[in-house]
Amino acid sequence: DALLARIEQAIADLDYRPSLMARGLKRGRTRLIGLIIADITNPYSVNVMSGIEAACREKGFTLLVCNTNNELDQELHYLDLLRSYQVEGIVVNAVGMREDGLNRLQQSALPMVLIDRKIPDFACDVVGLDNAQAATTATEHLVEKGFEAILFLSEPLGSVNTRRERL
């Protein structure tokens, strides 16, 4: 009992906090999920991030958020960073990873989900709309309401293939 009391006193005196990272690495479970997001200022992205964070918290995970600011090089940087933290999964809402980034993901065998993005010839889970069907339904609705001149507005299409699907 005396030894335990001395240990507890030393913990209090030193304000010791165990390293959750070290504990997670030792156990092989970090309880971390990485989110690579294209633009953290986009209201859609904020809503997506909020929902993902709530789901992670409910399951006992901590969400690490990485904002790429729509820069491809940042996507690769954050991908490597999240892998070094040994996250247990990655959620990606990004501009579009290059082939070397995709190869790194496939080799890591990390569970991954794409949000509102599709990467050709890359097998993984995707959460998003059927963009072509949604655009068709919206256009048909406007035509049925008597509209004749219909304008499509979007952020720049860039390399985001789901935006092209909406045309």
Walk through the language-model features, giving the residues of each:
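N-terminal helix-turn-helix DNA-binding module of bacterial transcription factors
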Residues: 1-31
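Bacterial carbohydrate/catabolite-sensing allosteric modules
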Residues: 12-15, 51-62, 77, 83, ...
